[in-house]
Swiss-Prot record:
It is a multi-pass membrane protein. Pfam families: Bac_export_2. GO terms for cellular component: plasma membrane. InterPro entries: BsaZ-like (IPR006307), T3SS_substrate_exporter (IPR006135), T3SS_substrate_exporter_C (IPR029025). The chain crosses the membrane at residues 28-48, 70-90, 133-153, 158-178, 181-201, 260-280. The keyword Transferase does not apply. It is found in: Cell inner membrane. It comes from Shigella flexneri. One of its GO terms (biological process) is protein secretion. Belongs to the type III secretion exporter family. Required for surface presentation of invasion plasmid antigens. Could play a role in preserving the translocation competence of the ipa antigens. Required for invasion and for secretion of the three ipa proteins. The keyword Cell membrane applies. This is Surface presentation of antigens protein SpaS.
Length: 342
């Protein structure tokens, strides 16, 4: 870590995310689940459906159809538990996806036996993150004590009033008590959560730090070494035969795909009334054609659809067929108009 003084590049962070090493603040997900769970339970949970189910059983003197009863129990279960469970699952998934920018950790499923290394395990025990978690646990215990105290001071009258409440009133009282204790805890925890977030982010960025050699290596991988790129351009020219170079020089224009197909168009009304295909090249040769055409001043026009059509329907040194003649002539006329304006 002594030599890792450079901030991580976007590529480094993206590659780390694919390995499951993206920044994820787990406490944020926990807080969202608690809040969503609390308010959905208070909003959707009701004992009235349960009471109606029991009332139906008692009215029928416990002589009911087992299949219908099972179906009714399932419906009541999903009405009471289904909605809170759905929203809790959603609140667990969405914050994680947002934090990871919807990048799936495709490389994280690979087995890594290095995690079984006892030396690494020992280092984790005495790591900064472990110390941070220790102090965080102490703070949360203090917060729990404060929550209990203030909850008791604020809601003790309501707690004792349950003795005089009806069944429906009990549900409302429990809902309020549940909401109050959750909100008290989150209110006292907010500073700890923010501080924990900042420390977690700093530790994550520290783990992602790069040395200058890593940055240089990444740059070469992405951009390619200058000498390598120069040599590659030379090879593109070398793979063209003299005949192909001559065909390029004599062409009116070259229609490009732009990187996989190159179609040369020759047109001279004094020799032939219709344009014909002077060359057809693909892949590396197509790139070489574009490079050489630019060097000798032959226009290259990017038209993906036309290039694909001509490649599929024509051969080298064949006249453009009637079906594609209009498109090719329009392109030639447009090119002449552009040249005349300059």
């Amino acid at each position: 870590m002594a030599n890792k003084t450079e901030k991580p590049t976007p590529k480094k962070l993206k590659d780390a995310a694919k390995k499951g090493q993206s920044f994820k603040f787990k406490d944020l997900t926990t807080v969202v689940i608690i809040l969503v769970g609390t308010f959905t339970i208070i909003s959707f949970f009701s004992l009235s459906d349960v009471m109606l189910l029991y009332r139906y059983v008692i009215i029928n003197d416990f002589e009911i159809n087992e299949g219908k009863y099972f179906f009714a129990v399932v419906i009541v279960f999903f009405k009471i538990i289904g909605f809170p469970l759905f929203f809790c699952v959603l609140s667990a998934v969405l914050p994680t996806l947002v934090q990871t920018k919807f990048v799936l950790a495709t490389k994280a499923i690979k087995i890594d036996f290095s995690v079984l290394n006892p030396v690494k395990g020992l280092k984790k025990i005495f790591s900064i993150k472990t110390i941070k978690e220790f102090f965080k646990s102490i703070l949360l215990l203090i917060i729990l004590a404060l929550t209990t105290y203030f909850f008791w001071i604020n809601d003790r009258k309501i707690i004792f009033s349950q003795v005089f409440s009806s069944v429906d009133g009990l549900y409302l009282i429990w809902g309020r008590l549940f909401k109050d204790i959750i909100l008290f805890f989150l209110a006292f925890s907010i500073l700890v959560i923010i501080l924990d977030f900042v420390i977690e982010f700093i530790l994550y960025m520290k783990d992602m730090m790069m040395d200058k050699q890593e940055i240089k290596r990444e740059y070469i991988e992405q951009e390619g070494h200058f000498e390598t790129k120069s040599r590659r351009r030379e090879l593109h020219i070398e793979i063209l035969s003299e005949q192909t170079k001559s065909d390029i020089r004599n062409s009116k224009l070259v229609v490009m795909n732009p990187t996989h197909i190159a179609i040369g168009i020759y047109f001279n009304p004094e020799i032939a009334p219709a344009p014909f295909i002077s060359l057809i090249e693909t892949n590396q040769c197509a790139l070489a054609v574009r490079k050489y055409a630019n060097e000798v001043g032959i226009p290259t026009v990017r038209d993906v659809k036309l290039a694909r059509k001509l490649y599929k329907t024509h051969t080298k040194y064949s006249f453009v067929d009637f079906e594609h003649l209009d498109e090719v002539l329009r392109l030639i006329v447009w090119l002449e108009q552009v040249e005349n304006t300059h």
